[in-house]
Amino acid sequence: MKKHWPENERIKRRYFTFLKEAKRHGEPTVDAAAKALNRFEIYTRYRDFKTFHFQQAIAFKRYLAEQKDQQSGEKLSKAALHATLTQLKRFFQWVAWQPGYKSRLQYSDAEYFNLSDKDAWVATAQREQKAPTLVRKQGA
């Protein structure tokens, strides 16, 4: 049975309001943040965010890299890893400045949610789009 830490629920609600109202993000962004936080909470067994330690971020990255996509059954793509970890990094950077968390969390600990440079490059690479052409291929 999953347990929710009430203080975590309150700070998440404040963060989602911050994303919507202050940062002017839409529902898809807020939903992505909620999904990333849910994955992290499942991994930590719903521990209080005030007990966050950078070792949790390192271990979570390894755990997430081994997870399978529900639809394809394959490991999560680098883009999915990047999106999840970026949402978590932004949340922990924000929460480190909130009252009640400033003395417990280090702003710099959120940096441990970064992928390696190579993986981040793969995750954010722009794929060349094939555009239609008016030139006919020979022999077609």
Predicted regions mapped to residue ranges:
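Flexible glycine-/small-residue-enriched beta->alpha junction loops
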Residues: 129
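Alpha-helix N-cap/N′ positions at the starts of helices
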Residues: 10-14, 139
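Basic, Lys/Arg- and aromatic-enriched nucleic-acid-binding interface segment
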Residues: 133-140
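A detector for short, charged/polar N-terminal pre-domain segments
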Residues: 1-10
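N-terminal core-binding DNA-recognition domain of tyrosine recombinases/integrases
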Residues: 13-28, 34-126
